Amino acid sequence: MKIGVVAYQGSFEEHALSVKRVFDKIGKGEVIPVKRAKDLDVDGIIIPGGESTTIGQVALRLGLLDPLKEKISQGIPVLGTCAGAIMLSKEVTDAKVGKKSQPLIGVMDASVIRNYYGRQRESFEATVDLEEIEGGKERFVFIRAPAISKVWGKARALATLNDVIVMAQEDQILTTTFHPELSGTTSIHEYFLRMVKR
């Protein structure tokens, strides 16, 4: 199994370490950085947190955005965390400025509000119930986190925090508004790798 992590900025190294920890449990696998379309020969893709506008602009400039969208549309499993969730959603607004124009992959039937909880100083940790993916309650890190304000079509909420969607899935697309790679647990990565294995 080969997992690619989009590696422009953000917590891509932490995602790679989390995936390697899961590989240590379930068997062999490889994690590679994805920066260009030629790097997309993988079984699953992770789009990490960071700054969604920057990630989108760099991916567009380096010719990754359209091939990535095509690969996801063809069914490759993808995990988007925080900024990655923003990139994958069809609708994006900003908590302060409203409608946001930025390069998106836009493949998931979801609407996301950027900076829902405020800016950097409003970052926090919270306990999220992972019952929908057969997990328990775990603490996760939220950094300038977005909120998934609604899902439709085949998309469904997997976890909420104070009635706000923080994790959702549509077929092979999984998104979280929190940072599982910074939270000391591999439960989200384990679930994602089970999706890839199917």
UniProtKB/Swiss-Prot annotation:
<feature type="binding site">
    <location>
        <begin position="50"/>
        <end position="52"/>
    </location>
    <ligand>
        <name>L-glutamine</name>
    </ligand>
</feature>
<feature type="binding site">
    <location>
        <begin position="143"/>
        <end position="144"/>
    </location>
    <ligand>
        <name>L-glutamine</name>
    </ligand>
</feature>
<feature type="active site" description="Charge relay system">
    <location>
        <position position="181"/>
    </location>
</feature>
<dbReference type="GO" id="GO:0008614">
    <property type="term" value="P:pyridoxine metabolic process"/>
</dbReference>
<feature type="active site" description="Nucleophile">
    <location>
        <position position="82"/>
    </location>
</feature>
<dbReference type="GO" id="GO:0004359">
    <property type="term" value="F:glutaminase activity"/>
</dbReference>
<dbReference type="InterPro" id="IPR029062">
    <property type="entry name" value="Class_I_gatase-like"/>
</dbReference>
<dbReference type="GO" id="GO:0005829">
    <property type="term" value="C:cytosol"/>
</dbReference>
<comment type="function">
    <text>Catalyzes the hydrolysis of glutamine to glutamate and ammonia as part of the biosynthesis of pyridoxal 5'-phosphate. The resulting ammonia molecule is channeled to the active site of PdxS.</text>
</comment>
<keyword id="KW-0378">Hydrolase</keyword>
<feature type="active site" description="Charge relay system">
    <location>
        <position position="179"/>
    </location>
</feature>
<comment type="pathway">
    <text>Cofactor biosynthesis; pyridoxal 5'-phosphate biosynthesis.</text>
</comment>
<protein>
    <recommendedName>
        <fullName>Pyridoxal 5'-phosphate synthase subunit PdxT</fullName>
        <ecNumber>4.3.3.6</ecNumber>
        <ecNumber>3.5.1.2</ecNumber>
    </recommendedName>
</protein>
<feature type="binding site">
    <location>
        <position position="114"/>
    </location>
    <ligand>
        <name>L-glutamine</name>
    </ligand>
</feature>
<dbReference type="GO" id="GO:1903600">
    <property type="term" value="C:glutaminase complex"/>
</dbReference>
<dbReference type="InterPro" id="IPR002161">
    <property type="entry name" value="PdxT/SNO"/>
</dbReference>
<dbReference type="GO" id="GO:0042823">
    <property type="term" value="P:pyridoxal phosphate biosynthetic process"/>
</dbReference>
<keyword id="KW-0663">Pyridoxal phosphate</keyword>
<dbReference type="GO" id="GO:0006543">
    <property type="term" value="P:glutamine catabolic process"/>
</dbReference>
<dbReference type="Pfam" id="PF01174">
    <property type="entry name" value="SNO"/>
</dbReference>
<keyword id="KW-0456">Lyase</keyword>
<comment type="similarity">
    <text>Belongs to the glutaminase PdxT/SNO family.</text>
</comment>
<dbReference type="InterPro" id="IPR021196">
    <property type="entry name" value="PdxT/SNO_CS"/>
</dbReference>
<keyword id="KW-0315">Glutamine amidotransferase</keyword>
<comment type="subunit">
    <text>In the presence of PdxS, forms a dodecamer of heterodimers. Only shows activity in the heterodimer.</text>
</comment>
<dbReference type="GO" id="GO:0036381">
    <property type="term" value="F:pyridoxal 5'-phosphate synthase (glutamine hydrolysing) activity"/>
</dbReference>
